[in-house]
């Protein structure tokens, strides 16, 4: 069994430490923040300023791999997650009745919850785990590195105090200092592939009133205009978030910080209006997030690993813009794989690097492609032109066969080519279009003139 040092106590760090500990490894988790999540979710969510983790207060939808990994590795955490208020939503719940079951349909489940609920459940489990020692308020300041070809990381430093480890896991997040430490230690530099995402997010949180309306009706959770996306994230404990997405260069972005302006703009989208009409209680200010990139940080190159005794996971490895909701899912998948292969990874990380390239890199590439297209479309207010692609998206909400394909892609279970390019899906979309010869791709949100008038008040 390996001695493992995990740097960073976010979702990926907690999940990695817990899964390693339950496999019998001796784990020390270092987290520079002295505070940890507890049982008061609203206090921790609405009143904990966490500038290093801007995504902590942004809305989340936890995709199928989150549920699958938790049920397989830590079923008690999954039970606790539901007990704390997370809710399961099956993609076929959109329909009055689920279609006849096919293999894999049981995986098409989104967990509707705030990130803090998962963090609280993982934190509680880590506290109970005797093989995991958490050192809060202890900032890792460097690595201990032994010479070799390649060099070997032998532990971490906390101030002047060394801590030996057979394997160090960098889960310090998108601002991880580890790549710079490796270069300073004389290692070949990590290979970084970074793409700026020209997309900005603004959200506001609400809570349904106990004595008020609770059902928005049968309405999609997403709407769009040529220059903006809008959506609602139903969440735990009667909370929901309204979310707007624009180009970072949109001149109206700053005005949306005003709650009155934000809500007026959000009401121009059917998805948001249906929920705002429930007269829910606002629970937060308007929360912006921008300045993001998609970044892949490989600790290996064409000559092999740049170092042994160290791997990265979570946002330290793959940081993706949140439009597709991949972050938590990919972080827990990596934690599961690492826990199952810790001893061999400590000896030689080549297998882990190969797995991340094969299993996770395609998701990164898909996010980059999606964000490039979205950023250009939002910046240019481009109209929809691909009739069949628009029909595929619309048809999913009428046809369970197409919804299944859509859900398989969304939940990272199949690639778009695998899910959509089948004879069955093609036949169903063709029939849907034939029944709607007048169908034209369109947006359900405001025009630019309407939007500008709303922002101007």
Positions of the model-derived regions?
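Short beta-strand to alpha-helix junction loop
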Residues: 61-62, 105-124, 177
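Predominantly flavin-linked oxidoreductase catalytic cores and closely associated redox partners
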Residues: 128-265
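N-terminal FAD cofactor-binding segment of flavoenzymes
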Residues: 19, 40-95
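General small-molecule cofactor/ligand-binding pocket signal
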Residues: 28, 133-135, 311
């Amino acid at each position: 069994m390996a001695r493992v040092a995990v740097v960073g106590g976010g979702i990926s760090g907690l999940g990695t430490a817990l899964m390693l500990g339950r496999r019998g490894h001796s784990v020390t988790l270092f987290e520079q923040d002295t505070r940890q999540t507890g049982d008061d979710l609203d206090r921790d969510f609405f009143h904990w300023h966490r500038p290093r983790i801007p995504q902590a207060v942004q809305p989340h939808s936890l995709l199928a791999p989150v549920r699958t990994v938790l049920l397989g590795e830590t079923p008690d955490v999954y039970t606790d997650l539901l007990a704390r208020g997370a809710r399961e939503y099956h993609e076929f719940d959109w329909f009055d009745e689920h279609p006849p079951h096919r293999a894999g349909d049981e995986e098409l489940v989104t967990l509707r919850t705030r990130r803090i609920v998962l963090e609280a459940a993982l934190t509680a489990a880590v506290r109970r785990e005797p093989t995991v020692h958490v050192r809060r308020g202890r900032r890792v300041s460097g690595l201990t590195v032994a010479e070799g070809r390649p060099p070997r990381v032998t532990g971490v430093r906390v101030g002047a105090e060394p801590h030996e480890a057979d394997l160090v896991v960098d889960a310090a997040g998108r601002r991880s200092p580890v790549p710079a430490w490796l270069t300073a230690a004389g290692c070949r530099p990590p290979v970084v592939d970074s793409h700026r995402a020209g997309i900005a997010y603004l959200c506001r949180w609400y809570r349904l009133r106990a004595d008020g309306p609770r059902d928005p009706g049968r309405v999609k959770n997403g709407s769009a205009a040529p220059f903006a996306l809008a959506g609602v994230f139903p969440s735990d404990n009667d909370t929901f978030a309204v979310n707007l997405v624009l180009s970072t260069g949109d001149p109206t972005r700053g005005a949306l910080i005003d709650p009155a302006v934000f809500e007026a703009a959000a009401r121009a989208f059917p998805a948001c209006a249906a929920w705002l009409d429930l007269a829910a209680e606002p629970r937060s200010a308007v929360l912006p997030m921008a300045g993001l990139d998609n970044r892949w940080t490989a600790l290996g190159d064409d000559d092999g690993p740049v170092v042994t005794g160290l791997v990265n996971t979570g946002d330290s490895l793959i940081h993706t813009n949140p439009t597709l909701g991949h972050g938590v899912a990919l972080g827990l998948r990596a934690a599961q794989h690492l826990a199952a292969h810790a001893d061999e990874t400590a000896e030689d990380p080549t297998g882990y690097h190969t797995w991340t390239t094969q299993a996770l890199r395609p998701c990164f590439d898909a996010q980059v492609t999606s964000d490039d297209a979205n950023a250009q479309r939002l910046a240019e207010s481009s109209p929809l032109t691909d009739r069949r692609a628009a029909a595929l998206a619309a048809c999913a909400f009428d046809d369970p066969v197409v919804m299944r394909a859509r859900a398989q892609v969304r939940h990272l279970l199949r690639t778009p080519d695998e899910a959509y390019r089948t004879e069955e899906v093609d036949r169903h979309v063709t029939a849907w279009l034939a029944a709607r010869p007048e169908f034209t791709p369109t947006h359900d949100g405001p025009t630019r003139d309407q939007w500008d008038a709303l922002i101007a008040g």
